[in-house]
Amino acid sequence: MAEEQIKKSLFLLLQHMEREEFKGYDPYDGLLSPLFKLPLLSAHHTLRFYAQQAVKRSRINLRPILGIKKGLNPVTLGLAVQSYTTLYSAVKKEEYRQKAEQLITQLEQFSAKGFHGTCWGYDFPWEARYATIPAYQPTVVATGIIANGLYEAAVQLSSQKAREMVVSAAEFVLHDLNRKTDTDQSFCFSYSPFDHEMVFNASMKGARLLSQAYALTGKEEFITTATNAIRWVMKNQDEQGVWIYSKRESGKWVDNYHTGYILDCLSAYIQLSGDTSFAPALNKGLNYYANNFISADGQPKFYNNERYPADCTAAGQTLLT
């Protein structure tokens, strides 16, 4: 019964995404409103930040009222590549391979220019507490999620184009991201080339990408760099197995999917590198995750101490983790 329900949900979602041509709203897309092109609103960071939060948190969808259209996010395409690849591997239906290849070609067109390798950002501008991020400005989060889908296509579909894009994206991680390095040479990757933020799940996505590029090429620089990035994040795991969101004072919370991202990336690194020294940290983190992010009735919780808001990313990440 549960398997049938999962299959039904999967194909209903897939049909919806294809019908919408992979376009949709994002929690942080509030600044796509034409209102924010007005002189007063285009440069007022605080006002834009709280307006973005209001659109995100509103119980009703304000986007049609504000003139915000559904966007095509490169991250969605990367996740769809991963999904079609997984479906093809499961049922060997050629249609899924072809759809994955089509999206891989489309992702090439969205890659940001002027960097050492392939990289991506979101299709909307957004306000972080520390900066204004323009649409399509590349981040290690967007790039890492997309490259993960491409890696699966490179391995499972033998896609040469996907392989080349993963290896190219690793050059972006190596040469364009900033680093905060400790005395033991462990370090944290920045969120983007334009900041020095220390966000745990973001740095782990960079490390996973390097591990995947190493698996495809055998290039030692990829894996030694990944190891030093992993060491930094593992030093910041507490005794319970927890990572907070970031080193910022405003980033002290613990939530479902950012924790899941760290665990997924760590698991991938261990498998691809053969380095089992971080297995105890993985097991401790997984134990904490299972005991604190899934309620007794099976519903994914958003925070470690709060079930709500009910969130599709938390639900999806719980299945993966």
Walk through the language-model features, giving the residues of each.
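Glycan-recognition and catalytic cores of secretory/periplasmic carbohydrate-active enzymes
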Residues: 1-321
